């Protein structure tokens, strides 16, 4: 995956490609290329109050939000025929926009559920409620879903994985630096405040808060870190249902699955991703009291409903998760939150209309041509590596040649005829209906069935891209095929430096520290010779060390192990895209535009993709959780290892970004 506003039409009418106002020519490119290429953009785009990070991605997403909101507003005005997808989109958007109704209802839509939990006095009563609401997982500290079997990638299998941490990462519960401790203390207060807002007394709120904190802290102790979760082989442990019951007798997996509509025959074999975590959960379950389980179930229900109730509840949620954790100053406006929620529940349906209105066929064709050129370039680079044997090269080239390429939008669209949106019910109740629909749909489509390679993992309007190892596919949604990633009016230097590197980035994921463990059919298998595998690990280990040495704040280093895959993909994307660009007629002509050679424009376009402003709190949050390096270091950390960049900008010894050639990292 590649991550984590003026309308594009207006941009396309003006100057194409690189924009002079986005640069800061007072900075030498050899000393700080990020500021040289994006300093002007940073000054022109100060951090908006509703963002903790605002960059080129976000600017484009803002434009998409406005487009999607226009679609929804039009649908609301037209009041389509009852039962049509268009009517459902409009009705759901209206519910999301109706804050007057939500404020009048307060927390009443979720009170029947909380009352059920509060009135369940015994463990058996509470566990019966867990089965009743199995689709929502209240109080269940593990996740499970049907996904491709990584060692038989054509078939889906039940995956069971660690879950249950409200803060996402274990470090928030266990680290003791001041920034983390402050967040943890604020989290404790937030839990109690939320229980009070939902009608519990001070004494109840504090007792339930303590129960939640105790349990989640114990979960943190047995959870793997984000870095440990990157080890694909260590996180694949196949077992039978009988073995699961023997190992984890206190976890009622079969009952939960059956309650959700999953037949036992479909879970006779499964993959347990983190066995030690489940062993810990099994032990915790054996000693848990009714009071503790009730508090956790209620907390899960509260957290899951907070964005769909009255403004005071949403404000409390925002104040902790956005303001405290990320440094955001103000919430998104109501229209934007409403638009995002419609996207979350019916995104593909919106995407179909989006593509009809905004995605030209010419963009799809040009993108497909670029991809073909970069596939040729990557093949050449694989063949040229002196550290790989011919056998491994052959397997790598076979994998590359079988990439399944997706551009723009899916070949088939999801049928939503069975999804019901009922305007007489609350916004929260309709969200629950949607969530249950998608949970049941996933079971119907995946349980006991082959993997559907035509299914997209992102909506067409998403500003991102991805590589999926189990289907060996690269996907570029329509949403990202716009400025500053792609400009049909710009020269090749711009498009190869921007979207070209994105394409190369996703291709390289097929051969990064995770992707290299999967063959051309998507199966996890070791297709490398032993020596080649060792060579790969030795080379990539240097990338991890290099990025871990970067200080992102005076008291905080980057995590090169967590970001390894993305850093490898950035490096590979740059090498592959530049190699392909050099073959273009425009590159060979060497025409100077705006005072820059084609090679210089290539690298400026690349850096422009990562232009951003960011809060300190967001930096700290991303270093803990994000497998991508910060934007500044995707430029200043990546380019000093690209020989062509030195030549393009005459970077020499003594310049701040200079690295001796024998110390530059190289893989592809």
Task: Identify the function of each model-found stretch.
Residues 1-14:
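Bacterial Sec-dependent N-terminal signal peptides
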Residues 13-21:
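Short, Gly/Pro- and small/polar-rich lid/capping loops
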Residues 22-43, 177-196, 564, 570-576:
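Hydrophobic/aromatic-rich, well-ordered segments within soluble, folded domains that form packed cores
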Residues 28-31, 36-100, 104:
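Active-site-surrounding "flap" and adjacent substrate/cofactor-binding loops of secreted or lumenal enzymes
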Residues 41-45, 167-168, 484:
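Short, solvent-exposed loop/turn elements at domain surfaces
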Residues 50-72, 205-222, 495-501, 599-603:
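Short secondary-structure subsegments characteristic of cysteine-rich extracellular domains
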Residues 61, 247-250, 271-275, 343-347, ...:
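Intrinsically disordered, low-complexity linker/terminal regions across diverse proteins
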Residues 75-368, 373:
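Noncatalytic, helix-rich "gating/capping" subdomain that lines the substrate-entry/channel surface
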């Amino acid at each position: 995956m590649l991550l984590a506003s003026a309308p594009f039409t207006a941009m396309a009418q003006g100057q194409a490609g690189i924009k002079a106002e986005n640069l800061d020519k007072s900075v030498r490119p050899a000393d700080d290329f990020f500021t040289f290429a994006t300093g002007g953009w940073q000054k022109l785009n100060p951090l908006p109050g509703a963002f903790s990070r605002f960059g080129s991605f976000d600017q484009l997403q803002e434009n998409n939000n406005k487009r999607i909101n226009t679609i929804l507003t039009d649908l609301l005005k037209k009041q389509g025929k009852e039962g049509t997808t268009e009517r459902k989109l409009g009705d759901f958007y209206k519910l999301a926009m109706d804050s007057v109704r939500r404020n009048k209802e307060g927390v009443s839509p979720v009170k029947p559920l909380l009352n059920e939990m509060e009135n369940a006095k015994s463990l058996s009563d509470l566990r019966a409620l867990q089965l009743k609401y199995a689709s929502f997982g209240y109080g269940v500290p593990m996740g499970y879903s049907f996904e491709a079997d990584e060692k038989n990638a054509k078939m889906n299998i039940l995956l069971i994985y660690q879950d249950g941490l409200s803060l996402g990462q274990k470090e928030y519960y266990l680290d003791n630096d001041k920034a983390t401790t402050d967040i943890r203390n604020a989290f404790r207060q937030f839990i109690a405040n939320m229980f009070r807002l939902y009608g519990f007394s001070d004494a109840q709120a504090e007792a339930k808060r303590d129960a939640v904190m105790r349990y989640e802290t114990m979960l943190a102790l047995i959870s793997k870190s984000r870095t440990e979760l990157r080890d694909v082989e260590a996180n694949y442990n196949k077992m039978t249902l009988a073995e699961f019951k023997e190992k984890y007798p206190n976890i009622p997996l079969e009952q939960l699955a059956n309650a959700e509509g999953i037949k036992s025959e479909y879970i006779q074999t499964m993959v347990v991703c983190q066995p030690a975590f489940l062993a810990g959960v099994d032990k915790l379950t054996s000693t848990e009291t009714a009071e503790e389980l009730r508090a956790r179930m209620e907390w899960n229900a509260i957290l899951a409903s907070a964005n769909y109730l009255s403004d005071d509840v949403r404000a409390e949620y925002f104040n902790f998760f956005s303001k405290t954790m990320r440094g955001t100053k103000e919430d998104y406006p109501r229209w934007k939150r409403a638009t995002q929620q419609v996207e979350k529940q019916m995104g593909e349906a919106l995407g179909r209309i989006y593509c009809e209105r905004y995605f030209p066929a010419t963009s799809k064709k040009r993108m497909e041509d670029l991809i073909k050129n970069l596939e040729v370039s990557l093949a050449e680079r694989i063949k040229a590596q002196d550290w790989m044997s011919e056998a491994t090269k052959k397997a790598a080239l076979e994998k590359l040649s079988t990439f399944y390429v997706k551009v723009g939008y899916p070949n088939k669209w999801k049928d939503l005829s069975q999804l019901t949106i009922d305007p007489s019910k609350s916004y929260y109740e309709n969200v629950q209906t949607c969530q249950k629909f998608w949970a049941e749909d996933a079971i119907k489509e995946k349980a006991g069935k082959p993997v559907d390679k035509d299914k997209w993992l992102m909506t067409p309007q998403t500003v991102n891209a991805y590589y999926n190892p189990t289907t060996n596919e690269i996907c570029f949604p329509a949403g990202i095929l716009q400025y500053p990633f792609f400009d049909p009016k710009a020269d090749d230097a711009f498009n190869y430096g921007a979207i070209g590197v994105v394409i190369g980035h996703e291709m390289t994921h097929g051969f990064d520290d995770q992707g290299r463990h999967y063959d051309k059919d998507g199966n996890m298998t070791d297709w490398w010779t032993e020596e080649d595998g060792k060579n790969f690990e030795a080379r990539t280990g240097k990338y991890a060390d290099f990025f871990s040495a970067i200080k992102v704040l005076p008291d905080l280093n980057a995590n090169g192990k967590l970001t390894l895959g993305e850093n490898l993909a950035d490096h590979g994307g740059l090498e592959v895209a530049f190699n392909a660009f050099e073959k273009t007629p425009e590159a060979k002509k060497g025409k100077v535009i705006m005072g820059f050679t084609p090679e210089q424009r290539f690298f400026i376009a690349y850096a422009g993709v990562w232009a951003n402003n960011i809060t300190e709190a967001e930096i700290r949050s991303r270093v803990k959780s994000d497998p991508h390096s910060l934007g500044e270091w995707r430029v200043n950390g990546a380019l000093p290892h690209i020989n062509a960049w030195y030549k393009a900008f005459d970077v020499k010894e003594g310049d701040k970004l200079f690295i001796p050639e024998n110390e530059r990292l190289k893989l592809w």
